[in-house]
């Protein structure tokens, strides 16, 4: 029996085995081995560290997303678009069937895997995965990186995505009836502390693919360099524990609002501390953050990368007066620029935000928030 969830029963792990078999059979019907090489389960379940939700009646349920990497043969763009369309339909079918998000990556050509850069999205799965369909050796050419190969930019990318979970949590808590969203809010508070832990370990060169090992390693660095909250280590441990043993919250909306408020305070402090480490300065304020961000150049600066960035920015915001430097950065730069306003209520004028996010001068705050979310969904 394969181990997917360490705190799940033998029956639960056998159930997930059956889910994998079922998905593999769907794949076999939909795709030819001439076009796709392998379907690989990553994420917590792929590493053998998936979560199990124990309900009051003794039932065990999937809780984490099922994250799959799709490894393709060398195919033309038209064929890839056809595959992507099938995967999109399959995502919706399987997510509805199993009650969790079943996500498929974009197709990754097998002959490009040896050239992958050390991104966090690949660091974890290459250290723990399961091929459920196709070539069992499909990932053998992916480089085996060390923790210090992960650049600090991986930490700030992670914080951007987890920050959006906090943004949506705050939005849900402002609703007249937030009760249907309490699980989402509790989950994203824990995920924020997971991300803060992981960001510190990345910057310190001590990141590890295993959740259990990260729980041990986070006690080693001088946390005071990043956060002043003396309870952070306990919150970090609780966040990591939640990854393995999730639960449904019993707190009231008001109690969750109080937890979220403290989480945002910690997250803001950590966010700027990680960026300070990224830029090699002792501390940051908003003005310094924006100035250094404006002068930052992407590490991927080949002529092809710069041309691609220019085309993406041109599509998103059109051609407007400003620095060429803004157009040749990957568009995620615009999200970093505006995140302190969106998440921390930083005093950035709407007239400055509008051109950054590709809206006309005079755009109101709600339009800017909606625009930010749409850009984040595009570049997440």
Annotate each predicted stretch with a short phrase.
Residues 275-380:
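Non-catalytic terminal regions of proteins
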Residues 72-78, 199-200:
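A generic structural motif
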Residues 1-33:
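N-terminal regions immediately upstream of nucleotidyltransferase
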Residues 24-66, 72-75:
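Active-site nucleotide-donor binding segment shared across nucleotidyl transfer reactions
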Residues 236-239:
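Short alpha-helical scaffolding segments that buttress acidic/His motifs in well-ordered protein cores
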